[in-house]
Amino acid sequence: MRGQAANLVLATWISVVNFWAWNLIGPLSTSYARDMSLSSAEASLLVATPILVGALGRIVTGPLTDRFGGRAMLIAVTLASILPVLAVGVAATMGSYALLVFFGLFLGVAGTIFAVGIPFANNWYQPARRGFSTGVFGMGMVGTALSAFFTPRFVRWFGLFTTHAIVAAALASTAVVAMVVLRDAPYFRPNADPVLPRLKAAARLPVTWEMSFLYAIVFGGFVAFSNYLPTYITTIYGFSTVDAGARTAGFALAAVLARPVGGWLSDRIAPRHVVLASLAGTALLAFAAALQPPPEVWSAATFITLAVCLGVGTGGVFAWVARRAPAASVGSVTGIVAAAGGLGGYFPPLVMGATYDPVDNDYTVGLLLLVATALVACTYTALHAREPVSEEASR
């Protein structure tokens, strides 16, 4: 289809910039905690707040994409994220924890971009290629890696508020380019039905809740680690904020690069098998992380491989969604599933902060909870989740 590659690439770039904006607080969390004398729980809440709003907002932006189209919604979310980015910069410059948490809520708007881009990418590709298209769009998660790597450095080079102004300018310029270049797929037809009934209809589909459960683990794990890993690394291994950001960027990049691999594999073998392998690997590697492997080589190998497992799983789950969700409900189902993924990323930082053992300096309890959850999901997928029948997968 003419224009599909260009539109997919541009939509992915829009996702990159919004994911960077969504993840602005996490890479600086250790600095905020030090400068504002925050407790572990307060720092965890600060990191988790944008994740919560980004998750819940996806329930709305998904069906709105069915109604107004991906082009309009990608532009709208990008523009709506500019002011919160600047407001967070002001609050950070003032050193106000309360304002940071408050404006961090609105920073979550940028995180809703995922529920917009998935149906947009779906509309441009045939069912047999949707694992690929959603995997490529999912590479927009690299924005978290860019944020983890560059945000602390930008603060050191340019200053705190200027860093936020740079991200706001990137959002604005991206929105302008999208207005000129981005187009909805020729086959897109707006769904004018009211949003609430469509959400209720999507909520009645078994695929919605099965995929929500699985995505809450694989994508939630990615989001949680991408935001909380700087705190984890500095606490456990004593690295500086910049060094922790670089290592977190490596984690996020590995997950991002693995996501299209998960989609590609799902186009060739059953997504169920891809997700099963992802969950089993996640459980094994989270257990290894709980043992606190030595810094550098062993810890890096553990977390990078964990990132690959999570990334492959995210690609596999959404390839599964693309096969099973009814065509008229893709946006609504995507919104709910994506929200579940975001919520899956909201609670782990809070749990990690609450279960941290300052005496032994470890997060063992939190990591073992991830092991148990991944094993439960793996067992459920093996025994109950099934591939779609042809009626579900038809478009």
Swiss-Prot record:
GO biological process, one term: regulation of nitrate assimilation
Regulation of this protein's activity per its record: Increased nitrate reductase activity is seen under hypoxic conditions, however this seems to be due to induction of the probable nitrate/nitrite transporter narK2 rather than increased enzyme activity of the probable nitrate reductase NarGHJI.
Localization per record: Cell membrane
Domain of life from the UniProt record: Bacteria
Record membrane topology: Multi-pass membrane protein
Cellular component terms per the entry's GO annotation: plasma membrane
Induction remarks: A member of the dormancy regulon. Induced in response to reduced oxygen tension (hypoxia), low levels of nitric oxide (NO) and carbon monoxide (CO). It is hoped that this regulon will give insight into the latent, or dormant phase of infection. Induction by hypoxia is independent of nitrate and nitrate levels.
Transmembrane regions: 8-28, 45-65, 72-92, 98-118, 131-151, 157-177, 205-225, 244-266, 274-294, 301-321, 333-353, 365-385
Disruption phenotype annotation: Wild-type levels of nitrite production in aerobic cultures, but hypoxic cultures show no increase in nitrite production.
Family in the record: Belongs to the major facilitator superfamily. Nitrate/nitrite porter (TC 2.A.1.8) family.
Stated role: Permits nitrate and nitrate transport into E.coli. Involved in excretion of nitrite produced by the dissimilatory reduction of nitrate.
Name of this protein: Probable nitrate/nitrite transporter NarK2
Source organism: Mycobacterium tuberculosis (strain ATCC 25618 / H37Rv)
Top-level taxonomy: Bacteria, Bacillati, Actinomycetota, Actinomycetes, Mycobacteriales
Gene: narK2
